[in-house]
């Protein structure tokens, strides 16, 4: 079976995050739908298995563990996808969102989690104190 040709490579730039060594990615092809060009740096992955198809991880976003981002999904900002989570289709996970456990996100479909921005969490906490 032929190995899937990847659209990115893991660079030598690494960070330690939650006890895992994550590598910054670099684009090997243009991905026009995300305004990514050959040579652009993206976010961080633990392994090649974390990212497939045309999906992209940008900025300081992190994907690790058995988590998989596929299809045309995009993870960016400071978002984290980990454990056994799956993000696929045309889904977008961004800002400080965390997708973990066995959560699954596809397009606008969410299963197994709620996503809140930090601003939304702060608002909820303020309302609870009243």
Residue ranges and their predicted role:
Residues 1-53, 102, 107-130:
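Terminal amphipathic alpha-helical/low-complexity segments used for targeting or macromolecular assembly
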Residues 53-108:
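A detector of tandem-repeat and repeat-rich interaction/domain scaffolds
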């Amino acid at each position: 079976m032929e190995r899937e040709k990847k659209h990115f490579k893991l660079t030598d730039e690494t960070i330690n995050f939650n006890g895992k060594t994550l590598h910054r990615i670099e684009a090997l092809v243009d991905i026009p739908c995300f305004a990514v060009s050959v040579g652009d740096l993206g976010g961080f992955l633990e392994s090649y298995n974390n990212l497939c198809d045309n999906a992209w991880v940008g900025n300081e976003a992190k994907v690790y563990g058995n988590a998989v981002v596929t299809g045309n999904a995009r993870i960016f900002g400071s978002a984290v996808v980990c454990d056994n989570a799956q993000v696929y289709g045309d889904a977008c996970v961004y800002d400080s969102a965390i997708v973990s456990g066995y959560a699954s996100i596809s397009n606008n479909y969410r299963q197994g989690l709620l996503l809140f921005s930090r601003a939304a969490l702060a608002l909820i906490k303020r309302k609870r104190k009243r």
